[in-house]
């Protein structure tokens, strides 16, 4: 940008902009935030605001755009949502008192990972992640600036780092080391993350655990440094860092969580249709965030799981108390967000009133829990500190109808401060005095229309029309002349006005000062407020689980020390809820101690995938402390769940369906243990028939011989069912069907043994394929099943058109029938039939 011959104000802008080249600089000028040069051009397009110019008559006018300061947040939100950073430069002194250029400084840099204020606040976490590297070790730290949560872990490879970032749904990553080209490609382009660099470490280590590994320490320290560098203030609400290991929880990678629809529906990207949607009967924002966290990280500690189950049972046993509890929770605001606003110095009167309302609800919540007289609730009750002194302070100080803007006045209650009350008394009396003066002068002058008005320029004045100017008293002095009237003052009116203006100014200043003192006092309670928030959130989640257990007819699962699975009449709770009035068909899942693999066969659309997801969903629900959809359930505690359900190319990274299949299979067999759960659905369909079948069999054998994990393996390769005779720990199950009068009904019921048919042609019929095509396919399938019986020969090819449909019409005997006769078509599946048809078509 050209900087020659700039005005002092523009030179100031340029100097500040140099310090923040990667951010839009919002430069406060009076009632607007202005943007200049490229920032103005780009912002005008993104925000759809007018682009003008400064010094329009100059040879090189400076592009300029601006937004009103009072509505700037909505524009900032748009920029942040699109992945930009925004630096806020404020006026640091009153322009009226400034000598020369008004002093301006950047007071905050807002980035996608550091959003605290928003015009559209929601209850989701916004995690900012930092990663550092030392040799082959990675440190990953993350925090939520709203809640103050702060965590760190160590990871052994970059794939795990990416998986954790995906799970957190982070938008910004702070890098403590130089990425390789491949790593930057993955983070920036494939994962669409905003990348920021921080090479300095934060010096104040009171939030850090000095027992952390070096790379965990540096990741945490650089994250703190970045946050303090961008926010430029004390962040007293940040909690001490908590170290965790992925293996401390039920491990599930991003693909697994997506395929199981845990927190959002994979197809719609929305909450509805997910486990989170099913379980969310929370009443508070803190509870909603905590529930999402529990779903992301189910437990593997049986004692902690049982502790949650016992509280759910207590709530189930106390229906009326639980109803009262639910009503009380509705009066609780987002304490964590309010605490962060206090820490950031952005609290307004509305925030404090919401905090007081919340604190006033706590004694009732605590009394309800104490009234249940259950020892298992003691740890929750201990966290419910109502902080009565804080509630009393806010209630006594803040007026119930206080405006949101601090400087609007009317914030502090009458009676809270004696001096403030005196100023307000002067203002009230001054108003009465003015009314008395108006009446007196109207009577003395005989001007019936005489009245006193006010504006900022002239203050209080007598308004006299031109027709009455001859009756103006001698002690009136002229203040302004208008077209049809004049404005006058008197010494008495000026004296009262002076008293009122002084009282108004002193009142406003004192009220602001009192509010600042109260806000500072509230800041002393941040840690206690965060403890309270955690307690309320936990109560809220557990009551939510109780409500869902009751309304969805769930039961308490039992955990054994063995690997046996015995789920009687289990259901997929989300599918059942989505189906609504339709009847869901329950299925029993039984895998004995010595059974590690169920080979699941059956037609497409018959329910194989739902059956598999049902087991995984039940395990997740059980291990997060929820009750489960079944008549009874006995489960082991799994350490990890691996899935390959559904097929899709990874278009972003250019990987085919088969490559994605193999990568996910490799992830499972590389990391699974005997305590894991593996779900593979139609593995191998992304490649040629025999390649796929060979790989599927070898993977089954590897799991059987080397891992021993509980595994559901759904396949269209019917030949694999013969493995039951050679693999001791494998059993066949299938989805039952009913054939009657040429019609096929899928019963969605799992039964022992292999499927005898795949009914692919029936599925094709449901899909709406042409009748003549289906008839021809049925004849070919019959021929293949009969081994050696001549199939109806195709018609003689006479044109390019007939070549396209030759497999479906009569024709002279074709040599290709010899190839058909050589095929091993015993129990051949429809998918294999389609593969054969493709090969035959290519040879015709």
UniProtKB/Swiss-Prot annotation:
Q: Which residues bind ATP?
A: 602-609
Q: Which residues form a coiled coil?
A: none
The alphabetized list of GO BP terms reads:
mismatch repair
Source domain of life is: Bacteria
GO cellular component terms, semicolon-separated: cytosol
Q: Does the keyword ATP-binding apply?
A: yes
**A Pfam family hit:** MutS_V
SMART domains linked to this entry: MUTSac, MUTSd
**Keyword annotations of the record:** ATP-binding, DNA damage, DNA repair, DNA-binding, Nucleotide-binding
Q: Which GO terms describe its molecular function?
A: ATP binding; ATP-dependent DNA damage sensor activity; damaged DNA binding; mismatched DNA binding
Question: Which InterPro entries does the UniProt entry name for this protein?
Answer: DNA_mismatch_repair_MutS, DNA_mismatch_repair_MutS-lik_N, DNA_mismatch_repair_MutS/MSH, DNA_mismatch_repair_MutS_C, DNA_mismatch_repair_MutS_clamp, DNA_mismatch_repair_MutS_core, DNA_mismatch_repair_MutS_N, DNA_mismatch_repair_MutS_sf
Protein purpose: This protein is involved in the repair of mismatches in DNA. It is possible that it carries out the mismatch recognition step. This protein has a weak ATPase activity.
User: Matching HAMAP family, A to Z?
Assistant: MutS (MF_00096)
User: Record's PANTHER family?
Assistant: DNA MISMATCH REPAIR PROTEIN MSH1, MITOCHONDRIAL, DNA MISMATCH REPAIR PROTEIN MUTS FAMILY MEMBER
Per the record, the similarity remark reads: Belongs to the DNA mismatch repair MutS family.
- The protein in question is named DNA mismatch repair protein MutS
Taxonomic source organism: Streptococcus pneumoniae (strain Hungary19A-6)
**Name of the coding gene:** mutS
């Amino acid at each position: 940008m050209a900087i020659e011959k700039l005005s002092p104000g523009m030179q100031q802008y340029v100097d500040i902009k140099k310090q923040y080249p990667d951010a839009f600089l919002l430069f406060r000028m009076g009632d607007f935030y202005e943007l200049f040069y490229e920032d103005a051009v780009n912002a005008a397009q993104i925000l759809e605001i007018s682009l003008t110019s400064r010094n329009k008559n100059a040879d090189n006018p400076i592009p300029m755009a601006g937004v009103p300061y009072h509505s700037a947040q909505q524009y900032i939100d748009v920029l942040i949502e699109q992945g930009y950073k925004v630096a806020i430069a404020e006026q640091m002194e009153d322009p009226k008192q400034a000598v020369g250029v008004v002093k301006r400084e950047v007071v905050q840099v807002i980035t996608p990972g550091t959003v605290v204020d928003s015009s559209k606040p929601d209850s989701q976490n916004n995690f900012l992640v930092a990663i550092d590297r030392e040799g082959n070790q990675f440190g990953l730290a993350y925090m939520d600036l709203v809640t103050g949560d702060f965590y760190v872990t160590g990871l052994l490879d970059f794939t795990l780092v990416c998986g954790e970032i995906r799970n957190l749904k982070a938008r910004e990553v702070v890098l403590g080391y130089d990425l390789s080209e491949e790593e930057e490609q993955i983070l920036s382009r494939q994962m669409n993350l905003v990348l920021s660099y921080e090479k300095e470490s934060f010096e104040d280590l009171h939030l850090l655990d000095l027992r952390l590994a070096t790379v965990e320490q540096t990741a945490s320290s650089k994250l703190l440094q970045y946050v303090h560098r961008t926010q430029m203030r004390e962040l007293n609400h940040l909690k001490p860092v908590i170290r965790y290991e992925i293996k401390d929880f039920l491990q599930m990678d991003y693909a697994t969580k997506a395929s199981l629809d845990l927190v959002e529906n994979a197809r719609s990207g929305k909450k509805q249709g997910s486990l989170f949607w099913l379980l969310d009967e929370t009443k508070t924002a803190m509870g909603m965030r905590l529930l999402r966290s529990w779903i992301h990280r189910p437990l593997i500690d049986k004692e902690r799981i049982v502790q949650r189950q016992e509280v759910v049972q207590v709530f189930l046993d106390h229906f009326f108390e639980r109803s009262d509890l639910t009503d009380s929770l509705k009066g609780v605001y987002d304490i964590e967000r309010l605490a962060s606003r206090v820490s950031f110095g952005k609290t307004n009167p509305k925030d404090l009133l919401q905090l007081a309302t919340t604190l006033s609800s706590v004694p009732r919540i605590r009394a309800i829990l104490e009234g249940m007289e259950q020892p298992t609730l003691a740890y929750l009750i201990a966290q419910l500190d109502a902080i009565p002194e804080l509630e009393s302070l806010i209630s006594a100080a803040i007026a119930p109808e206080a405006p949101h803007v601090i400087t609007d006045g009317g914030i502090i209650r009458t009676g809270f401060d004696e001096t403030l009350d005196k100023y307000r008394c002067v203002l009230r009396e001054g108003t009465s005095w003015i009314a008395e003066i108006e009446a007196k002068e109207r009577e003395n002058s005989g001007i019936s229309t005489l009245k006193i008005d006010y504006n900022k320029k002239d203050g209080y004045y007598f308004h006299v029309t031109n027709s009455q100017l001859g009756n103006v008293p001698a002690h009136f002095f002229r203040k302004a002349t208008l077209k049809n009237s004049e404005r006058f003052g008197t010494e008495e009116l000026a004296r009262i006005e002076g008293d009122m203006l002084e009282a108004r100014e002193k009142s406003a200043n004192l009220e602001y000062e009192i509010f600042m003192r109260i806000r500072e006092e509230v800041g002393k309670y941040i840690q206690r407020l965060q403890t309270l928030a955690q307690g309320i959130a936990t109560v809220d989640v557990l009551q939510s689980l109780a409500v869902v257990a009751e309304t969805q007819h769930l039961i308490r699962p039992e955990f054994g020390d063995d690997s046996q699975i015995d789920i009687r009449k289990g259901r997929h709770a989300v599918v059942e809820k989505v189906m609504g009035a339709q009847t869901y068909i329950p299925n029993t899942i039984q895998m004995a101690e010595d059974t590690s693999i169920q080979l699941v066969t059956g037609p497409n659309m018959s329910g194989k995938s739902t059956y598999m997801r049902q087991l995984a969903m039940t395990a997740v629900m059980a291990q997060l402390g929820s009750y489960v959809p079944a008549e009874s359930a006995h489960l082991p505690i799994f350490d990890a769940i691996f899935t390959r359900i559904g097929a899709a190319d990874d278009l972003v990274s250019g990987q085919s369906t088969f490559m994605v299949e193999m990568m996910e299979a490799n992830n499972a067999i590389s990391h699974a243990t005997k305590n894991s759960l593996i779900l593979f659905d139609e593995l191998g369909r992304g490649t040629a028939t025999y390649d796929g079948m060979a790989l599927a069999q070898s993977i089954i054998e590897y799991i059987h011989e080397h891992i021993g994990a509980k595994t559901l393996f759904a396949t269209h390769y019917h030949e694999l069912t013969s493995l039951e005779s050679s693999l001791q720990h494998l059993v066949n199950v299938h989805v039952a069907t009913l054939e009657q009068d040429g019609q096929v009904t899928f019963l969605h019921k799992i039964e022992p043994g292999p499927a005898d048919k795949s009914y692919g042609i029936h599925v094709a019929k449901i899909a709406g394929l042409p009748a003549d095509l289906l008839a021809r396919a049925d004849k070919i399938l019959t021929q293949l099943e009969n081994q050696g019986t001549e199939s109806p020969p195709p018609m003689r090819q006479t044109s390019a058109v007939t070549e396209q449909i030759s497999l479906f019409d009569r024709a002279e005997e074709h040599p290709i029938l010899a190839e058909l006769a050589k095929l091993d078509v015993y129990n051949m599946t429809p998918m294999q039939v389609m593969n054969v048809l493709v090969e035959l078509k290519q040879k015709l």
